[in-house]
From Swiss-Prot:
Keywords: Protein biosynthesis, Transferase. (6S)-5,6,7,8-tetrahydrofolate binds at S110, N111, L112, P113. GO terms for molecular function: methionyl-tRNA formyltransferase activity. It catalyses: L-methionyl-tRNA(fMet) + (6R)-10-formyltetrahydrofolate = N-formyl-L-methionyl-tRNA(fMet) + (6S)-5,6,7,8-tetrahydrofolate + H(+). This is Methionyl-tRNA formyltransferase. It comes from Bifidobacterium longum (strain NCC 2705). Attaches a formyl group to the free amino group of methionyl-tRNA(fMet). The formyl group appears to play a dual role in the initiator identity of N-formylmethionyl-tRNA by promoting its recognition by IF2 and preventing the misappropriation of this tRNA by the elongation apparatus. One of its GO terms (cellular component) is cytosol. The keyword Protein biosynthesis applies. The keyword Protein biosynthesis applies. Pfam families: Formyl_trans_C (PF02911), Formyl_trans_N (PF00551).
């Protein structure tokens, strides 16, 4: 039985933790995660999903900073043979990597070397990739550049959000992850160097990145919305009274409008506007459309500043928008 230490923090790491804990080939001797963080309106300290799961499973938890002497002492006391790390949220220094004899192995949500970095699933959706996947690779000091031990590939539907894609990859990747590390322990694993071609970086998506430019084409905005859902959330500024006609300046202070779901407008629907200017709003009885750099985009779910998430048509009726209302 391999003694395994597991490092992870968010929900996407939980299926893998549960899979290792349930597999008789492994003894999960410890779980490393980030410290409790303030959440919600009350800013109450809350354990990470991985810590909460570890405590439910009766597993010892280390939630110290990885560069502290106390962390190294706690890690060494586990006497782990092998380590799994998935979405931990901290860079592991060399002394930590060297402390586990068989090494550290990461489950990464792309087919490497494409989309190395922090947001692989999000970037795959935003780019309109037809496929993506998950790889298990040995962690080194470089960024996601270690040899691959196992890999799976899936087709994208073209309608999933990044949250849905991550959930799917987390579930489908977990059994592969467990089998890959078992093979490493048994000495039967194959280590394949990453190809030299096809390298792209999946930089973290910032709040400013998530702001919609309505001069982009409808299909591109649709991908942006899905890539940014649920985090950080695609958004725009709503000018409910519209611009002033003589100088095109907004008539009132704008409000933030989060776009939770949208899709390129159905051009076969007779109610769909034939043409709208970028950012121009058109409200129908059951639909809300926005002009883009190509065809209109239909908004299906939104969250206005200070309001709850709701169907776009319901929001528009309650907002009592001026006919000149626009988004920018």
């Amino acid at each position: 039985m391999l003694k395994l230490v597991f490092a992870g923090t968010p929900d996407v790491a939980v299926p893998s933790l549960k899979a290792f804990a349930a597999d008789p080939r492994f003894d999960v001797v410890g779980v490393i995660t980030r410290p409790d963080a303030p959440t919600g309106r009350g800013r109450k300290l809350t354990p990470s999903p991985v810590k909460a799961t570890a405590l439910e499973l009766g597993l010892p938890v280390i939630d110290l900073k990885p560069r502290s002497p106390e962390f190294m002492e706690a890690l060494n006391n586990l006497h782990a043979d092998i380590a799994a790390v998935i979405a931990y949220g901290n860079i592991l220094p060399k002394n930590v990597l060297d402390a586990v004899p068989m090494g550290w192995y990461n489950l990464h949500f792309s087919n490497l070397p494409k989309w190395r970095g922090a947001a692989p699933a999000q970037r795959a959706i935003w780019a309109g990739d037809p496929t993506t996947g998950a790889d298990v690779f040995k962690v080194g000091e470089g960024l996601d550049d270690g040899p691959i031990v196992a890999s799976l590939t899936i087709e994208l539907t073209g309608r999933e959000t990044s949250g849905e894609l991550l959930d799917r990859l987390a579930e489908e990747g977990a059994p592969m992850y467990v089998d890959a590390l078992a093979a490493v322990g048994e000495g039967t694993a194959t280590f394949t160097a990453q190809p030299a071609e096809g390298l792209e970086y999946a930089h973290k998506i910032t709040v400013e990145d998530a702001r919609i430019s309505w001069t982009d084409e409808a299909e591109a905005i649709d991908r942006q919305v899905r890539a940014c859902t649920p985090h950080p959330g695609a958004w725009t500024e709503l000018f409910a009274e519209g611009p002033i006609a003589d100088n095109d300046e907004p008539a009132a202070k704008p409000l933030t409008l989060h776009i939770l779901a949208a899709q390129p407008a159905d051009q076969s629907n007779p109610n769909t506007p034939a043409e709208l200017q970028p950012g121009e709003l058109k409200v129908g009885k059951k639909n809300v459309w926005v002009g883009t750099g190509s065809t209109p985009l239909e908004l299906t779910q939104v969250k206005a500043q200070g309001k709850k998430a709701m169907r776009a048509a319901d929001w528009a009726r309650g907002a009592r928008l001026s006919p000149a209302a626009c988004v920018r």
